[in-house]
A protein has these predicted regions:
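C-terminal, well-structured catalytic/ligand-binding subdomain of enzymes
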Residues: 2, 6-174
Length: 174
């Protein structure tokens, strides 16, 4: 199982220089590592000792007007407590979030990867059948979001679909 991601969250050169890898040994749960930056609480990319990986990609959201669970806390909880994809899905499903995100979850135990798609009003899981590849950019792919107007707009108006197609092209070449 090979999981890759580009870290294209860019807010200036100084920010780009200050990445760090944290090794966390919590009092409860599974030790994990996280690729982050100083001051960040939670996880945007990481892997736990049981072989669960998480990476997040932002989807199209409306401006949040209420506080709920930050997505980086959800992904941290997945790394700290999940040993399988089903456990990761259960953790994500029990949390209410205030933004839309795709959480790519890989599992050494399951020898598989899925995309958990969360938003304030919906939840979906994208599984690829009969394929060794799953691609995740900045739009949702599960049946739960098939008719979602915000997601359809994201596909048409953003660079997400282009990035998805480019990923397919590059992996086909190599």
């Amino acid at each position: 199982l090979l999981i890759g991601r580009n870290f294209d969250f860019y807010v200036g050169d100084e920010f780009a220089k200050n990445k760090l890898v944290e090794f966390i040994e919590p009092e409860n749960g599974i030790p994990y590592l996280s690729v982050s930056w100083p001051g960040m609480i939670g996880v945007v990319s990481g892997m736990n000792k049981e072989g669960i990986t998480v990476t997040i990609n932002a989807g199209k959201s409306k401006i949040p007007l209420t506080a709920k669970t930050p997505i980086s806390f959800v992904t941290r909880e997945i790394l700290q407590y999940a040993t399988t994809i089903d456990e990761a899905i259960a953790i994500a499903k029990k949390r209410k979030v205030f933004v839309s995100e795709s959480i790519l979850v890989g599992s050494a135990n399951d020898k598989n990867a899925v995309i958990i798609e969360v938003s304030p009003d919906n939840f979906g899981v994208y599984r690829v059948e009969n394929s060794s590849k799953v691609f995740c950019t900045n739009h949702f792919q599960s049946e739960a979001y098939k008719n979602d107007k915000r997601n359809q707009k994201q596909i048409v108006e953003s660079h997400s679909e282009y990035r998805y197609e480019k990923l397919q092209e590059l992996l086909q070449e190599n």
